[in-house]
């Protein structure tokens, strides 16, 4: 977007510019990374982080210092693994062992990988992977063990999918396969992060006993991305929408993108959104377990972005024609709200759930189920943060009683004041009349004079009235029409 186009856009959408400016000016990170105290390999890791994901880089660099480097390295390790899996130029016979043995390779000092295709966007990370390995050697053993264990699980899962000819040819078939794929690429990430949070005492240990909450966090993010990226994946000959869902609406996958099937495609996307929305309550419950503000920000921002993205793609025909994403202004607004507390984040979810409900079409076969799910989200939020808090109601009633009593007191004071003023006037009037009488005033003569003057005025008015009546003719002649 050119400078002139941007200026015109912001003139027409001033609220977008306002949100961006507010975020830039008023956002104060909980923690700030200090590059002056970092080694060269640490600085290199953060450069790789910024090159692979600017959005995640920003929130990672504001984390509590205890988790700053472990989570940065965790992200880079999984990104390196993902870069190998996504590269279609690597032969399967070479790719499978790389994925399965990646956790062992990252223990070899100086190991790098230079065989990615030239167009693979994150190939530089693997070319300089020795920087990541050098820093992995320095992290605390409990953190390293968590990173390694998740890398083993994810590498094996990716290798299994790479060998799955049916998946590679026809994509995902069932909802179970769809959720298993989301587990390997996102659910495991959530598991690793939760264990890191708890190990550092920055999250409630009870989260380890409710791993379904962690799973929902990853599922919600990954499903949202899959729905949003449908056009991009179609162009790349990939299909992640389960056949169990899309086959209800069209005969072939290609039919989803034909203009004449647009309404059917929208109904299919509605069911996909419904499938993602079922994780929202777990996500909100999970966020309540964060004990550190920077960690809360880290988990809340992506979730708020996800619910906003679901609202954007819901019944939006543009997703079948191009890639869509929330505006930068909306993103800044969401980040401002998501870096406060759980109550504010719940309000974000409530707001977007209501927007989804408003966009819902009664002709859509998923209309009722989506309406119910939106209602469940509101009901869950209401159970955490009641809008009619009994304590607040009692306090308001007490304040109203005090105000009523104050008004009653005020009314009594006002009456007393008016009567006092009238009494003062009578007393002052009496004193003045008494003083005049003592000075020799003749009130009897004044009374007679006033009576005579009033009689004269009355008689004169009667005479004028009689003369006027006698001058009016008794008959009025009308001209011929």
UniProtKB/Swiss-Prot annotation:
Pathway the protein acts in: Terpene metabolism; lanosterol biosynthesis; lanosterol from farnesyl diphosphate: step 1/3
Keyword Kinase tagged: no
Keywords: Endoplasmic reticulum, Isoprene biosynthesis, Lipid biosynthesis, Lipid metabolism, Magnesium, Membrane, Multifunctional enzyme, NADP, Steroid biosynthesis, Steroid metabolism, Sterol biosynthesis, Sterol metabolism, Transferase, Transmembrane, Transmembrane helix
Stored SUPFAM superfamilies: Terpenoid synthases
Single annotated GO MF: squalene synthase [NAD(P)H] activity
Family to which the UniProt record says this protein belongs: Belongs to the phytoene/squalene synthase family.
Name of the protein in its database record: Probable squalene synthase
Biological source species: Neurospora crassa (strain ATCC 24698 / 74-OR23-1A / CBS 708.71 / DSM 1257 / FGSC 987)
Gene name of the record: erg-6
């Amino acid at each position: 977007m050119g400078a002139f186009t941007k200026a015109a856009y912001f003139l027409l959408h001033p609220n977008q510019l306002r949100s961006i400016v507010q975020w830039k000016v008023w956002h104060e990170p909980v923690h700030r990374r200090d590059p002056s105290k970092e080694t060269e390999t640490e600085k290199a890791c953060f450069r790789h982080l910024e090159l692979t994901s600017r959005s995640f880089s920003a929130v990672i660099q504001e984390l509590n210092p205890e988790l700053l480097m472990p989570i940065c390295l965790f992200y880079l390790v999984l990104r390196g693994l993902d870069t190998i899996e996504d590269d279609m130029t690597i032969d399967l016979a070479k790719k499978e062992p790389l994925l399965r043995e990646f956790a062992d390779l990252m223990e070899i000092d100086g190991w790098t990988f230079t065989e990615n295709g030239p167009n693979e966007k994150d190939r530089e990370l693997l070319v300089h992977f020795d920087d990541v390995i050098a820093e992995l050697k320095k992290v605390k053993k409990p953190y390293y063990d968590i990173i390694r264990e998740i890398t083993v699980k994810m590498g094996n899962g990716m290798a299994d999918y790479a060998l799955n000819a049916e998946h590679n040819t026809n994509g995902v078939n069932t909802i179970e396969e769809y959720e298993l794929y989301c587990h390997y690429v996102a659910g495991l990430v959530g598991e690793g992060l939760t264990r890191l949070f708890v190990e550092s005492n920055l999250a409630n240990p009870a989260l380890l006993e409710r791993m379904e909450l962690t799973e929902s966090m990853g599922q919600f993010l990954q499903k949202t991305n899959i729905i949003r990226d449908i056009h991009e994946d179609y162009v790349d000959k990939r299909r992640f929408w389960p056949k169990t869902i899309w086959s209800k609406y069209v005969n072939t996958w290609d039919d989803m993108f034909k203009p004449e099937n647009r309404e059917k495609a929208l109904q299919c996307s509605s069911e996909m959104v419904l499938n993602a929305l079922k994780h929202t309550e777990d996500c909100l419950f999970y966020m309540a377990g964060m004990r550190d503000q920077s960690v809360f920000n880290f988990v809340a921002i992506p979730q708020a972005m996800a619910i906003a993205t679901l609202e954007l793609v819901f019944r939006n025909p543009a997703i079948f024609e191009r890639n869509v994403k929330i505006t930068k202004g909306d993103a800044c607004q969401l980040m401002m709200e998501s870096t406060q507390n759980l109550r504010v984040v719940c309000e974000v979810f409530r707001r977007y759930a209501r927007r989804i409900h408003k966009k819902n079409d009664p002709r859509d076969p998923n209309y009722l189920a989506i309406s119910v799910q939106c209602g469940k989200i509101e009901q869950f939020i209401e159970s955490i943060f009641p809008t009619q808090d009994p304590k607040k109601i009692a306090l308001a009633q007490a304040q109203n009683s005090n105000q009523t009593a104050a008004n009653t007191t005020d009314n009594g004071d006002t009456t007393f004041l008016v009567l006092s003023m009238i009494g003062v006037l009578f007393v002052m009037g009496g004193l003045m009349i008494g003083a005049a009488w003592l000075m020799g005033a003749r009130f009897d003569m004044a009374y007679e004079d006033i009576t005579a003057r009033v009689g004269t005025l009355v008689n004169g008015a009667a005479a004028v009235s009689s003369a006027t009546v006698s001058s009016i003719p008794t008959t009025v002649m009308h001209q011929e029409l």
